Amino acid sequence: ENGEPLGIFRENALELVYSKALTPDKESFKKMIHEACKALNSYGVTSAQTDDFVAFPQVDYEVLIAAYQELEKEGKLTVKINQQAQLVNIEDLKEFIGKGYKTGVGSDYFKIGPLKLIGDGSLGARTAYMTQPYNDDDSTCGIPIYTQEQLDEMVEYAHKNGMHVVIHCIGDKIMYMVVEAMEKALKKYPKEDHRHGIVHCQITTKELLDKFKELKLHAYIQSIFLDYDINIVEDRIGKERAKYTYNFKTLMDSGVITSN
């Protein structure tokens, strides 16, 4: 602020921190995964979705894939894993698909799931990307991670190469951008059961809710966010916009496939 560092890192600036973090090796990954499986099994959980590829950005994703595959061969992967492939740019996506990976590739216990993208930030940090400025800070509309052109390119490439696409969207502006990218891809390469979707779907509009049904998008709603964000939503975006937040029942009643 005013040219002075505050010690706060937001969105892409976090790469400066991640790049200095310790780098686990494959055996360390195997130990962490095995311990996580045991914890999940203790609660009766037998399948999970995860997006591990950028948990340690300095580690090649094939090291992580190998860790899962070796655990499966050893009989220690006791939770069925669907790996949401978080790849941050078009170059990484092209390389990934070029190596033969896409949605559905794998075994009964470890499969590649959808391409996972992070579209914006969070409501609490005012980094969710909004069409209008924040109610309690009119100097910002939040932070988009991608431009429209970048989203268009990545969504189209994944779609035409057999990958489902799921994108984290909190704010309404980023949701408009993502819906536009998905609509363009579907018009260019029509596919009935595409299974593309939006994660969180927090701050919507009637137009966006209608688009979910029209394009047959899935909604990954994650209602646990209500525990925190419901207490700040009116402060952040005002009462009028708050009417179109967490409209999960509306989505379900309209026939949109939702999951938690």
List each language-model region with its residue ranges.
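Short amphipathic alpha-helices and their capping/turn segments at secondary-structure boundaries
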Residues: 1-3, 93-115, 204-216
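Divalent metal-binding segments
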Residues: 1-98, 113, 117, 122-174, ...
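Extracellular/periplasmic catalytic domains that process cell-envelope and extracellular macromolecules
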Residues: 74-76, 103-109, 190, 251-253
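Structural detector of well-ordered beta-strand residues that form the stable sheet scaffold
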Residues: 82, 166, 197-199, 218-220, ...
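Polar interaction faces of repeat-based domains
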Residues: 180-190
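Active-site-adjacent C-terminal substructures of enzyme catalytic domains
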Residues: 203-260
